[in-house]
Design a protein with these regions (language model features):
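Conserved catalytic cores of phosphodiester-cleaving nucleases, focusing on short active-site segments
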Residues: 82-83
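Basic, Lys/Arg-enriched alpha-helical interface segments
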Residues: 1-65, 74-79, 88-111
Length: 111
């Protein structure tokens, strides 16, 4: 069995977001994360946002787009920190959500 290329850490907000979704949706989100952590390279599942250090886990379920924002921490071990999630309603990722993830990232590395 292949070793994961990163370990996912969920903030409380990201955890709450996933737990509040229907079980089938949260299962698919975790399934897609597991695929990416296992080494699958697929921009439909995990994509770096332009002009940012923020990435998004992308899940499509019943024509609804779910996004979980995240960033990398490779200091001691390879971690991906998931900051928060949204149910995407527009084509473009809302800039306020990217800014929120960037603020959480900045605070994380300050400590």
């Amino acid at each position: 069995m292949a070793q994961n290329i990163f370990r996912l850490v969920l903030t409380d907000e990201a955890q709450t977001f996933i737990e509040c979704l229907p079980e089938a949706v949260s299962y698919k989100i975790y399934y897609n994360i597991k695929r990416v952590a296992g080494g699958e390279r697929n921009k439909e599942l995990f994509k770096k946002l332009e002009n940012s250090e923020i990435w998004e886990f992308r899940t499509l379920y019943n024509k609804t787009a779910y996004r979980l924002f995240a960033f990398w921490d490779k200091d001691k071990e390879t971690l991906v920190i998931a900051t928060h999630g949204i149910i995407k309603k527009t084509q473009k990722t809302p800039s306020k959500e990217i800014a929120k993830a960037e603020a959480i990232r900045k605070e994380y590395f300050k400590n």
